[in-house]
Amino acid sequence: MRVVPYGETALYVDLEIDDAGARRERTLAVARALAARLPDADVVVGAGTIAVVGVSGWDDLEATVRDAMRAPPLGQGSRLHEVRVVYDGADLAEVAGAAGLSTSEVIALHAGTTYDVELVGFLPGFAYLAGLDERLVLGRRAAPRPRVPAGSVGIAGPYTGIYPQSSPGGWHLIGRALGVVAFDAERDPPALFQPGDRVRFVPSHVD
């Protein structure tokens, strides 16, 4: 583990764990332990990293982090979201070709996994969902789109995700989520998906 100052009122924690599954579980457990110990701070989860913002007193903070590292695993208390998806994305056929699969096989693989929300970033409410079948792991598009519609379901690298707002984007689009408001500034918390939640996609059709 590496703990370093991150400006005058923040610190950065790198758990330095290589295994993706173990890294994800440990990061969330430590982040929740830190949030409980530092209720006035903002604890921001990354991929195996944690930023703690709005704190001071380096020596005490380092001791607090090392104490939080002993936090037990989270267990099975996370929320499960089931998201209906119409698999008609603009890149579905291209993804299938790159993976050497049929479009039906791509859909079955994507919908056959329960994903973990590893972190939220890029856009407000954009959840990086870990657990993508390795056969669907692709680099980002060579040319990002200037506009990706809100609700689009994409894949890039080891992640899948739902675009919460219309924005530029370079992920491969394979479908669109139905009835999901991934971010609402009037909601508490504004982001629907939180680190530690789980997400399952359900293939659907529009009547």
What spans do the regions from the language model cover?
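Glycine-rich active-site loops that engage anionic ligands at enzyme catalytic sites
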Residues: 1-207
